[in-house]
Amino acid sequence: PFPQYGCAVHGAAFTAPEETADRVLSGFTAPDDGLVHIGLLHGELTGSDSRYRPLTTAAVAASGLHYLALGHVHGCTGVLRIGSVPYAYCGCPEGRGFDELGDKGFLAGQVSPEGAELQFVPFARRRYRIMEVDVTDGDPAALVSAALPAGAEEDIYRVVLTGSPAAPVSPER
């Protein structure tokens, strides 16, 4: 607890390659002590088996938390609700590969007993993007250059060439 800040943070480490049971929220209820109670967990909301600390909607709803910050999903869900408990996967601050496209960042705002008012704040220095370029009847290098948007050097691109070029493509160009 951090009474000087009016809150308590409840969490647990992910200490093994797999956590196949919810040993954190199952049976947990935040005390009614006047503090704002925030849960901070790496876990997966699922009704089925998971290797990544499966969390049930029933356990979340019964937790009495004022907000549950979840990690595992690398895309931001925005603030959602299970029962009276607001929760979100905030995503990750930087994409790590082409399976994590688009804006990455964090959630910032206020959590109170009445709810969570949080906004997504873009943070990533670079975004991963996939772009298709039809190279039929043209110079592939010129077509790719023309297709790249202004500021493309700020991001990381996978360029997928489609179609049939008029001449063989040389990797040196």
Question: PLM features: what roles do these ranges have?
Answer:
Residues P1-A88, C92-G105, Q110:
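His/Asp/Glu-rich metal-coordinating catalytic cores
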Residues P113-R173:
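Accessory, non-catalytic peripheral segments of nucleic-acid enzymes
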